[in-house]
Amino acid sequence: MAKPIIPMPRSRFLRVKCIDCGNEQIVFSHPATKVRCLICGATLVEPTGGKGIVKAKILEVLE
């Protein structure tokens, strides 16, 4: 099987649920800065220089 000319990106958008307040929010899987909950301010995703550490419950991976 031939390799595609333009590879698909490995990064995704994620629908996550805050553990503290239950707010659902869409975040990027490879963030450059800390992503905080819009309601309570809890950290949802921390950057690591690549794929972020998700500290919330992942509900869905968006295409």
Swiss-Prot record:
<feature type="binding site">
    <location>
        <position position="40"/>
    </location>
    <ligand>
        <name>Zn(2+)</name>
    </ligand>
</feature>
<dbReference type="InterPro" id="IPR011332">
    <property type="entry name" value="Ribosomal_zn-bd"/>
</dbReference>
<keyword id="KW-0687">Ribonucleoprotein</keyword>
<protein>
    <recommendedName>
        <fullName>Small ribosomal subunit protein eS27</fullName>
    </recommendedName>
</protein>
<comment type="similarity">
    <text>Belongs to the eukaryotic ribosomal protein eS27 family.</text>
</comment>
<keyword id="KW-0479">Metal-binding</keyword>
<dbReference type="GO" id="GO:1990904">
    <property type="term" value="C:ribonucleoprotein complex"/>
</dbReference>
<dbReference type="GO" id="GO:0006412">
    <property type="term" value="P:translation"/>
</dbReference>
<keyword id="KW-0862">Zinc</keyword>
<dbReference type="GO" id="GO:0005840">
    <property type="term" value="C:ribosome"/>
</dbReference>
<feature type="binding site">
    <location>
        <position position="21"/>
    </location>
    <ligand>
        <name>Zn(2+)</name>
    </ligand>
</feature>
<keyword id="KW-0863">Zinc-finger</keyword>
<dbReference type="InterPro" id="IPR000592">
    <property type="entry name" value="Ribosomal_eS27"/>
</dbReference>
<comment type="subunit">
    <text>Part of the 30S ribosomal subunit.</text>
</comment>
<feature type="zinc finger region" description="C4-type">
    <location>
        <begin position="18"/>
        <end position="40"/>
    </location>
</feature>
<keyword id="KW-0689">Ribosomal protein</keyword>
<dbReference type="InterPro" id="IPR023407">
    <property type="entry name" value="Ribosomal_eS27_Zn-bd_dom_sf"/>
</dbReference>
<dbReference type="GO" id="GO:0003735">
    <property type="term" value="F:structural constituent of ribosome"/>
</dbReference>
<feature type="binding site">
    <location>
        <position position="18"/>
    </location>
    <ligand>
        <name>Zn(2+)</name>
    </ligand>
</feature>
<dbReference type="Pfam" id="PF01667">
    <property type="entry name" value="Ribosomal_S27e"/>
</dbReference>
<dbReference type="GO" id="GO:0008270">
    <property type="term" value="F:zinc ion binding"/>
</dbReference>
<feature type="binding site">
    <location>
        <position position="37"/>
    </location>
    <ligand>
        <name>Zn(2+)</name>
    </ligand>
</feature>
